[in-house]
């Protein structure tokens, strides 16, 4: 699956890459303003990648076609999951990461991040990627295909830093689902940096500040 990717660099010869996956119904432009608020100049020039999800029918929305990383089959997002669609997106994200490595950015200097559906795919991809990444950042999402993670997870990323953030009033991905995801990762030994905020299914200024500090740490 070939994806259109919006690319932005803060300077020539970037020293790290941050790959950010948008949520259901959005596109890559959605998180460009957030990235612009992340001053990582102390690390050096950064390349940001914002891929656009393919437009597919989404079952929970009556089959209406919209940008989505995978199909949502029902209101309970973990009861029935579109494993085929998730695996296809995982392959596409692997290809994007591998392309960055070919462009001269070591895997240890690459962060994969995402919001909502994008969070799910960032976790799915990053935890299974065969080379050690700098970190995984998940916003307002959940751990997909959790039952397969123990068998499929990458030994190289067994201790990869994970940033998870969620709104306490999220009506799209309820907070208990995010807490269950956090606890599942912690039980497997991942170092999870957990944050919750008084907000709905969105991003807030305090969260962006926490993302900034975490990125400075994992990319230092």
Q: PLM ranges: what are they?
A:
Residues 176-220:
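C-terminal catalytic histidine-bearing segment of alpha/beta-hydrolase fold enzymes
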Residues 22-24, 110-115, 167:
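Conserved alpha/beta-hydrolase "nucleophile elbow" surrounding the catalytic nucleophile
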Residues 31-36, 150, 174-184:
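Short alpha-helix in the alpha/beta-hydrolase fold that links the catalytic acid
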Residues 157-162, 188-190:
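Short, proline-enriched alpha-helix->beta-strand connector loops that line the catalytic pocket
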Residues 164-166, 170:
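Short beta-strand/loop motif that positions the catalytic acidic residue
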Residues 1-108:
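Serine-hydrolase catalytic machinery in alpha/beta-hydrolase-like enzymes
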């Amino acid at each position: 699956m070939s994806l259109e990717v919006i690319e932005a660099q803060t300077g020539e010869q970037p020293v790290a890459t941050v790959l950010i996956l948008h949520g259901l119904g959005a596109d890559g432009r959605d998180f460009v303003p957030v990235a612009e608020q992340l001053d990582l100049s102390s690390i050096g020039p950064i390349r940001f990648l914002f891929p656009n999800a393919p437009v597919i029918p989404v079952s929970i929305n009556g089959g209406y076609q919209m940008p989505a990383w995978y199909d949502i089959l029902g209101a309970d997002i973990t009861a029935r999951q579109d494993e085929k669609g998730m695996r296809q997106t995982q392959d596409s994200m692997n290809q994007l990461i591998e392309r960055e490595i070919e462009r001269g950015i070591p895997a240890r200097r690459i962060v994969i991040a995402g919001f909502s559906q994008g969070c799910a795919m960032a976790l799915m991809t990053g935890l299974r990627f065969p080379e050690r990444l700098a970190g995984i950042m998940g916003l307002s999402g959940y751990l997909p295909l959790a039952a397969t993670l123990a068998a499929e997870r990458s030994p190289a990323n067994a201790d990869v830093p994970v940033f998870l953030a969620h709104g306490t009033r999220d009506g799209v991905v309820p907070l208990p689902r995010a807490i269950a995801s956090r606890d599942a990762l912690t039980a497997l030994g991942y170092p999870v940096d957990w944050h919750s905020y008084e907000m709905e299914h969105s991003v807030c200024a305090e969260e962006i500040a926490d993302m900034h500090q975490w990125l400075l740490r994992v990319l230092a």
